């Protein structure tokens, strides 16, 4: 287990399963808002951090938000399908892109709850070899691209045992796929 100390002095324990750094390229489709995170970062900049825009879209508002703003909007990272998870061609990114569905090692939140699971508990305690698909992702902060009729869904990735990590895959009903390795703070396009 790795211990990280944050700016405010809180300690975050991160499981070894919580790290994944796949090779990436620059997205030709999307760009995102990027804030410099430190003790000087304002709430407005933090709230915008990670928001995704089409490559030809003009952000409104656009940085700088204030005289000392260090935010930028720049092309986001992209990862090739099959590399977005640790599972290669057996991974959720591969299956969603090629088959339009998750692989068989996924269990719905409802089925997981029927086994006795509750938030904060390890799914592996109730069923081995399965990852959770949590259903619709509401995109409450609006960071994922929005369009009329677009619905987002979410599922765990790179989870094998113990407490769930911060890795998720989100996909839309119209074919967009992104992964996050920091629990929705930032996203990477799956191409």
Where are these regions (language model features)?
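General secondary-structure propensity
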Residues: 57-58, 95, 175-177
